[in-house]
Amino acid sequence: LRQPSSASNRTAASLDGQETPFQYEITDHGYGKDAVKVLHVSRKGPVHTIQEFEVGTHLKLYSKKDYYQGNNSDIVATDSQKNTVYLLAKKYGIESPEKFALLLGQHFLNKYSHVEEAHVHVETYPWQRVCQEETKASTTVGQGSCNFSSIDNRSLHNHAFIFTPTALHYCDVVIXRQDPKQTVITGIKGLRVLKTTQSSFVNFVNDEXRSLPDQYDRIFSTVVDCSWEYSDTDTVNFSRAWQQVKNIILRNFAGDPQVGVSSPSVQHTLYLSEKQVLDVIPQVSVISMTMPNKHYFNFDTKPFQQIVPGDNNEVFIPVDKPHGTIYAQLARKNLNSHL
């Protein structure tokens, strides 16, 4: 959970309660409860909807007397923060991680006047409905997965779900009492992808430190981490926007299902994804993305020509360390960001 970044300019308090300058001062502080797990079930007729979150709440108080004096009178206990997660989920339900985080953060500021800042972190557990193909008898040959992009609502189960950890949906919300703007940052973590062709890397710096040859056709694999900040939280559909960003990343990486898309570098694919997000979702002000290059090297069959004659373009050695790391942040001009 990211700590609140702003530092207080208040002077330190002495042990007798009087504020006095010390040689040292606390420049940042806060506390909270992490890893609060909650499952919410919406039961509207026979069709149930679930949301499972892992929530962290951190508060920053105006006072530092709990640190300087051991005076706990302003502390909203972390156990109380944990209970608040469950109570607000029961009272208001859960629509999206971002809206629930906004609800929690605003609640802490409204209820406790001595809270200066609230920061809420939410991670979503990726449940999807079981589809009809998965509930049939196990005589069908295949991987047993359902193509969620090609099924209609009639084939989705009303109340049974399957855990599908393709990528993590998370958000961070920071609400400061003195700042009218609510900071909402949403992210994708751990989106692992691979394509077997249409990736090249050529014409890079050629000097005495280079050993890598030009690669005109290589395996391209990465694990995408991406986060973006909203400039407008009133008009955006958070869940739809998250899915749009994910789809944009996959489309720029993979291209058309039949012919694919050429990638001259990880950098170019990353930039095209970020640019399209800003083009398509006007509420996003800035987006940051990291794409580590997960290497797959050809197994050298030259010493084994009597066993496997010819070239090898089928067997590869996965190498996770060391790996390249490519990242960039793309922003609309003249906008401030907390990313």
From Swiss-Prot:
Enzyme class: oxidoreductase
A Pfam family this chain is assigned to: Uricase
Gene Ontology biological process: purine nucleobase catabolic process; urate catabolic process
GO molecular function terms listed in the Swiss-Prot or TrEMBL record: urate oxidase activity
Record keyword Oxidoreductase present: yes
Annotated localization: Peroxisome
Motif window: Microbody targeting signal: 337-339
Catalytic activity reported: urate + O2 + H2O = 5-hydroxyisourate + H2O2
EC number in record: 1.7.3.3
SUPFAM superfamilies in the record: Tetrahydrobiopterin biosynthesis enzymes-like
Pathway: Purine metabolism; urate degradation; (S)-allantoin from urate: step 1/3
Cellular component aspect of the GO annotation: peroxisome
Keyword terms of this UniProt record: Oxidoreductase, Peroxisome, Purine metabolism
Binding site for urate: T78, D79, F201, R218, V266, Q267, N293
InterPro entries assigned: Uricase
Active-site residues, record numbering mapped to chain: K33, T78, H295
PANTHER family, alphabetized: URICASE (PTHR42874:SF1)
Function: Catalyzes the oxidation of uric acid to 5-hydroxyisourate, which is further processed to form (S)-allantoin.
Stated family: Belongs to the uricase family.
Protein name: Uricase
Organism: Drosophila subobscura (Fruit fly)
